[in-house]
Amino acid sequence: MRLIIIRNDNNSHSQINKGKEKDIMKKIAILGIILTFFTNLSFAAEVNVFSARHYDSDIQLYKKFTEKTGIKVNVVSGKDKALQKRIIEEGDDSKADIYITADAGRLGEFDAKGMFQNSMTSAIKAAVPKNFRSTNWTGIAKRARIMYYSPERVTANELNGMTYEGLADPKWKGRVVIRKSNNIYNQSLVASLVKNNGKKSTCEWSKGVVANMARDSKGNDRAQILAVAAGEADLAVANTYYLALMLSGQKGEEQQAAAKKVLPFFPNQGDRGT
């Protein structure tokens, strides 16, 4: 089995509103990495992709691949856990050639079960930075988990030098919203803090964040942004692309209007970065 991990990320405020030309170039770049995987499979007439993603852009990439190679792409879509369960249960009889999902946390868990094989090639090493790949999987896009704030209630001075660690600062008491800790995005964020600060420090940090919550954790990432827009909180943690989705109007006028009331902030710019 081969594995591709998909990540989505924007590294600055300006990148949230990419133009069509840059978007097309990004898709072409992603296609190039996917082709690297596909062409390393046996010279088969078709390839089976098990994907936990649900974006039309992926389908367009598969179509381009088929046009380029003549190899048919069969896509099996589903929730991440359901796909993993199926692959495990089918064992050696699984038809999965490539597994696509989001977040390294999910990949680490699945890889620990021995479900992947070495998929590294010189082409992947040349195209993907070392910190975005492992022996058994590679990232082909990235995303950031950032903060969103109300410009009406949060001052520039408060955000000066703001870090993820700063979410535990008592000055944010009753002002922070973030989804539940069982969410994989939050688990990966916590894992990065453990890596950089150690388990003991991160444990104390988590207690501080809970103490600063404006309300009990509930809802998805967009719900956190909506809470800030509604005045229920001043600071939210969510992935970058959700703001872009809301601003696009695809989720309705209410969410579009709410997205215009918040601003994104990229923490830890003074040290390891977002």
Across the structure, where does each feature detected by a protein language model lie?
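Short, Lys/Arg-enriched N-terminal segments with co-localized hydrophobic residues
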Residues: 6-24
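Extracytoplasmic/periplasmic substrate-recognition and gating elements
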Residues: 219, 223-226, 230, 238, ...
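Residues embedded in well-ordered beta-strands
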Residues: 48, 146-148, 263
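Early extracytoplasmic/lumenal segment of secretory-pathway proteins
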Residues: 44-109
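Bacterial N-terminal signal peptides
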Residues: 31-40
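Extracytoplasmic ligand-binding site segments that recognize negatively charged/polar headgroups
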Residues: 52, 56-59, 95-232, 243-249
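Generic structural signal for residues in well-ordered beta-strands
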Residues: 73-75, 176, 262-264
